[in-house]
Amino acid sequence: MPTNLPLLLPEQPPPTGTAHPNRFVSEMGAVGMPSFESFAPSLHRERWALHAGQPAATCAKKRCVGSNVMARRNFPCDSLILAYFGNALRLAPGGGQGWFNRTGIEPFRAQLYLCSVAQALWLKSAVEASRAKNELGLLLWSLNDQWPTGGWGTLEYGSSTVAGQVLGGRWKPIHYLLRRTLFANVIATCGSAGQLPRFATCYVRNDGAAPFHGSVRISAVELSTGNSTRLLTFDARLPAGPGALRLLPTLPLDHIDGSTHVLLARCNVASTPAGGHRHESLASGSLVSRNEVLLAPPDELLLPAASVHVAVQSRRGDGDAVKLKLTANATALFVHLTTLANGRFSDNFFLLPAGSRTVLFLPFGPLDEKLLRSSVRVDHLQHRLGTASNS
């Protein structure tokens, strides 16, 4: 299956907005596995693998012959992992059965993490491609999983009475992307219009009910050093949406390679929109969306060896939110926090250059700080590709 990375964009976008022919897209999605915390309690330890460490069952017309316990765990993500990580894991197309059958805590955690990353990247490309067209509505399938299994949800199963689950459903990586970037009113992204590796095509789009006046800043982050180079600053003045789209100036990519750099696109408010809705009345300079853009599939990235540590600090003074400090000794990509405590993080699944960053844990209901401290853990792409290939 194609990864659509770099994102393929039209050289000239079609006319957009309600005055032009448009469509509503319903529905699309991609399979993603839940976290180890969610999935593992439903399996015996010797079955902790995407293929359960068992011979494959034969399934057709909703009937399976064989004893493989994963045969009825809904939808597999083999094709996604092979497409996005097959080269890095040295898996042949259509192969890798031994890798999918590796059992144990760390192999299973790596398999589940890589599946969730692939789900997020596939949907990210699909949504960004959709917003480059005059598509004024998009329905993703689906919101939540119906039990701890491989499924289409952006949230895990949400019954807190079942072992490993959190109240309302633990957010998968894709759900954090939807909140931070993909379903933000204003988004900027970049891709190829047949011009890579020398140039990138970028757009900014406003689907909000109010006009947007702000800046779009696009930088290139070097993976080996974490150094950031500003490539473009654009004064964006967009009418009210939906479908207010502007093509940005063509971006030269001199000395920038998709395997060594990622792009960072940030949209900031320049001034508060007069008469704007409450959620649109942001302070001058406020960040409205942040987008980390790959110019190559993830298995082509030259990621440095990185160690990322998380430390639970203290409650924020105005409530039950808890500060967590993440520290990396080198650039880490797709840094993802997981915990057994009921709640979500203020941000998750992001690029972390060498240094530290603070995020908040926002509890669902009463805070269980002891459980948060004892169960929080962190993943990132280079680490999990290593544990997946060396286990």
Each predicted region: which residue ranges?
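Conserved active-site loop/cleft motifs that coordinate metal ions or position small ligands
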Residues: 136-142, 336, 375-379
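Active-site proximal loops enriched in glycine and acidic residues that flank catalytic Cys/His/Asp
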Residues: 142-143, 190, 204-206, 216-222, ...
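Terminal connector regions
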Residues: 201-204, 244-306, 364-391
